[in-house]
């Protein structure tokens, strides 16, 4: 399945708009893991533990998006928007949302 943040795909013609599709992932944060990550895992201003969780959440959200698009008979999703937010008490959870327009395309 073709995925794009742009409204079109170069070299393809959109033949049908199938609808808006979304994917969400909410991952809980482990307080002790996060505490130790902030102490020992920050290298050059980056935290490997947080980055791993972000990648995992993003993969889940994109998988849901693609499954919804496939259920609509689409072979591409255009206009994708990806957002990250902390939710829950004291930002204890990470939410990743992805949305776009499911379309059918041909070369």
Curated annotation (Swiss-Prot):
Coiled-coil annotation reads: none
The protein, known as: UPF0145 protein PC1_1703
InterPro entries registered for this protein in UniProt: UPF0145_dom_sf, UPF0145_YbjQ-like
Q: Which domain of life is it from?
A: Bacteria
Question: Would you identify the family this protein belongs to, as annotated?
Answer: Belongs to the UPF0145 family.
Show the disulfide pairing: none
In which organism is this protein found? Pectobacterium carotovorum subsp. carotovorum (strain PC1)
Annotated PANTHER family: UPF0145 PROTEIN YBJQ
């Amino acid at each position: 399945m073709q995925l794009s943040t742009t409204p079109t795909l170069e070299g393809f013609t959109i033949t049908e708009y199938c609808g808006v599709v979304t994917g969400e992932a909410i991952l809980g944060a482990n307080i002790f893991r996060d505490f130790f990550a902030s102490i020992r895992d920050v290298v050059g201003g980056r935290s490997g533990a947080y980055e791993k969780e972000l990648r995992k959440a993003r993969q889940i959200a994109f998988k849901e998006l693609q499954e919804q698009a496939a259920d609509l008979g689409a072979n591409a999703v255009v206009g994708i928007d990806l957002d990250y937010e902390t939710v829950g008490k004291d930002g204890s959870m990470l939410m990743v949302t992805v949305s776009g327009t499911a379309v059918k395309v041909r070369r």
